[in-house]
Regions:
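Catalytic cofactor-binding cores of redox enzymes
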Residues: 1-171
């Protein structure tokens, strides 16, 4: 992405995927109660809170669109991740996708996916064990996720010649 700031951040996706956006909002509200905060800190926390509300509104719009198109599975996924943490692999991938793209939208294009294997594996493993997901279905979901992450990379000259901000750590 030619206009983004090179920042190479690796957000704590694991916490938000596991606990949800409402938990993040509660965390911010608790920090806002600290009487020793200065004005800059108050503005920062309020901005973070407003960003989460905006993400939730975006998810709500996608949920309504899914319902209009009779995509009930997608609508249910979106309804859940709008407030709660992910309950399965599909929801975890969807919330990660929205969080990742929301950070992009803020102009931070080098936000890596970090230790994807560590925070996604528990959802994958649990779904396999309880029979709600097959390895083939998981592969399809992962394939779609990574294709979407790089959907527009061919639009930018030289994009695949170096770090494109889509770093993934495995191991």
């Amino acid at each position: 992405h030619e206009k983004g700031t090179v920042c190479n951040i690796s957000p704590n996706y694991a916490y938000t995927i596991q606990h949800g956006l409402e938990a993040r909002k509660q965390e911010i509200r608790k920090r806002q109660e600290n009487p020793s905060l200065n004005e800059k800190e108050r503005v920062f926390l309020n901005s973070m809170y407003q960003c989460i509300i905006s993400i939730q509104k975006l998810i709500e719009k996608y949920e309504q669109y899914a319902l209009l198109n009779n995509e009930t599975k997608i609508a249910h996924t979106l309804h859940t991740i709008k407030t709660e943490g992910a309950q399965n692999f599909r929801q975890a991938l969807q919330l990660l996708r929205i969080l990742h793209f929301s950070i992009w939208e803020a102009g931070n294009y080098h936000n890596t996916l970090g230790r994807f294997d560590q925070y996604m594996y528990p959802f994958y493993q649990r779904d396999l064990e309880n029979g709600t997901l097959t390895k083939e279905e998981a592969f399809d979901l992962l394939e779609e996720f990574f294709l979407v992450c790089n959907k527009d990379s061919d639009l930018y000259p030289g994009m695949q010649q170096g770090d494109n901000g889509q770093s993934l750590v495995l191991g």
